[in-house]
Structure formats: structure tokens, C-alpha cells
Amino acid sequence: MKEMYAQLGISSEVYDFGHKIEESLKERFEKFDKTAEYNQMKVLLAMQKNKVSAECFGSSSGYGYDDIGRETLEKVYADTFHTEACLVRPQITCGTHALAIALFGNLRPGDELLAPAGKPYDTLEEVIGIRPSKGSLAEYGVSYRQVELLEDGTFDYNSIRKAINEKTRLVEIQRSKGYQTRPSFSVKQIGELISFVKSIKPDVICMVDNCYGEFVDTIEPSDVGADMIVGSLIKNPGGGLAPIGGYIAGTKECVENASYRMTCPGLGSEVGATLGVNRSFFQGFFLAPMVTKGALKGAVFAANIYEKLGFPVIPDSTEPRQDFIQAVSLGTPEGLIAFCKGIQAAAPVDSYVDPEPWDMPGYDSQVIMAAGAFVQGSSIELSADGPMKPPYAVYFQGGLTWEHAKLGVLMSLQKMVDKGLVTL
């Protein structure tokens, strides 16, 4: 095996260092295996219950009326996530788009949106109107309020209680930390927050941004009271095969409201051609528990490797995982660049490309990105990026298989060793 890694540029020293770390993680990895096995059975049961057949893999065009594959897939998602209804569509271009559809579909002028975990993803700032933008919720008369987390990264229940008022219509809970330094939330924590919110105002819609979280646990936020969960098919649930798409799962009313924003009033979920992606959507969802498991193993492997070398990592090497994003503070621009070059060199696509920092629109510093993916922007595929400013943190994620995620981590370490940035 070592000889095969040598052909890919991994030295004996780096391979042995990684092998020792991997051996120490066997018990942890077995837990991921058990979670994936449970979730695999859950998806399989949903597919069997809804009688998925070869007919479901057909294509529709134009209006997309009576697309049996689309309709069956949405039932499979709803049964897997234990919700009343679901939209799963290629017309939803990304996670931000799915969230925007869900928000606009369920909020009206005069309503207020509450974020109880601080500011959401940067990409939602213009959707909400935190940063002025044409067509934002703010422009339509929807107000916004946020409550910061406590210093220990937990919910500030006293401030949340005070923030909820007669205008509060929807509470948006972001499960994953994304590119923030706060902890990601467990499903249990989210359930406790939802129970608290609904004890104050029962008619509030609790929506969870589920991106990066699907199949990490054996339960989803929809199992603990969420009215809607929203995500992207180029993350976990697409299993690396979905070329595009997003989903909105939840109560029949919430999903129906969202459908009228996705298309238009009067049409809703009845239209939307699938254009030949049904097979990829079904197969990707079937594989998603296993693919997510590989990405989780890669994240924990990276945390253990770099923590052992003295780098601050978030989450740390022993924390329970709520998503597969791993942050490593590398301390120097050279370290960040070397790490990303290693990830790119491990890619199946564009491995010959040399990533460099660049002025990315919307950021106050240069950013370096590494991704050699089959699907552009796919977060479930091996990738890494980070802003060129202290603490020079890299955000590592993905890997369609554990073996590929492992190679990516070893290759990042190899590049740092070659540059003299670490000593093993």
C-alpha cells in the first residue's frame, strides 16, 4: 500500500505518521459506520415503501406535469426525513436559493424573521436585507432580528425570550457553523431550542438550515419539531452524484407555501421538468449515508493529524461531529497556501492546477480555494479554502470516499513538510 501512495507523492514518513493516527481512530470510525448503516436502512425503507422502479428514472420536459420520478423522489425524501411533504428540484440551484425560497414563501410584509444563533451565512445577508440588496426580504417589509450566542457557544435563552414578539413569524436556525468559529449544533440542541420557542409562541415556524448536516446523525431536525428543513443536493443528500438541486422538507403548509415561491401562485409543485436528473437524484440519495460517512472520517482524521502537530482545530479531535467541516488555524500564509495546494494535488479533476490567493468578490481579503470536483461547488467532494488573513484558517471538507479524503489530508501534510513548515 505504501508503494501506491509513494506513486502519488506521499513520502514514507508522512504515510507512517498518518497510519498511526488512523489506527488510533478505529473505535471512532466504527461509530460512524453504525450511523451510516442505520441511515442506509432508513433510505432503503423509504425507497421500498414508495415502490421506486426503473420508470422513475425517466425524463420530463416542458411543464413537467405528472413526472412520476419527481413525485416518487419527493415522497422518498419526506419519508426519510419524517415530514409531511418535500420539494426536491433541479430548479433549486443551491442551498442559499433553497433557503430563500423557503423564507419568501412563508413570510409576509409585517412579519419578523428571528435568527437565534447570531448572523447566518454571508450569502443570506442580501436575501434578508442585512446588507442592502434589490429584492431582499427587507425590501418587502419583513423585519429581521438576531440574538447572539453566549460566550460558550450555546443559545441565550433569556435574550431569545425577549426577542420573540407578536411580529415573530419564522425562526431560522443554522445547524452547521459553516465558516464561523462557533460550534455546530446537535439535533438534540436544536430540538430543545424549538421546544423553547414554541412554548412562547406556538405558531412560529421553526426552519432549520440543514446544510452539511444530513445523515451525520440517525435523526434530523424534522424529528425534533422543525417545521421545515432545507438543504442542497450538491452537499450530503446528493451523494456526489446530483449535478444540481436543493430540497425543502416539512409540514404540508410550509412546503406548499414554498412551492408557490419556487414557481408561481397557482402552479406550485405541479410543474418543474426534471430533464434527465432523476436517476442521479435517486442514486445519490441512496449513497448519501455512505458518502457522508467518508467525509466525516476525513474531517476527524484531519483534526487529529493537525492537532497532533500543534495546530488549533475546530472542532477539536475528540468533539462529537455535527457536520464534516474541519477548520485548522495554520498560522501563516505559507501554511494555508501549502495545505490548499496539497488538496488540489489530490483531486481527480484539475489535479495539475496550482491554486493561488485571489481577490474574491465579497471578501475583505484575498481567498485561496482548492477543489478538483466533478460538480462545480460541490461541498461533499474534497475541497479546502480560506481567507488570507490571521489566523490563516483553512476550512477542509468533503471526500466522496474515506480513502480519497485520507489522501487529501496526507497530501496537504506532505506539501507542508516539503516547505519545511512542519516536522514529523
Where do the protein language model's features map onto the residues?
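Conserved C-terminal alpha-helix-loop-beta "cap" of PLP-dependent enzymes
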Residues: 307-424
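Acidic, PIN/NYN-like endoribonuclease modules and their adjacent C-terminal/linker elements
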Residues: 36-40
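Flexible linker/loop signature enriched in Pro/Ser/Thr and Pro/Gly
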Residues: 60, 80-83
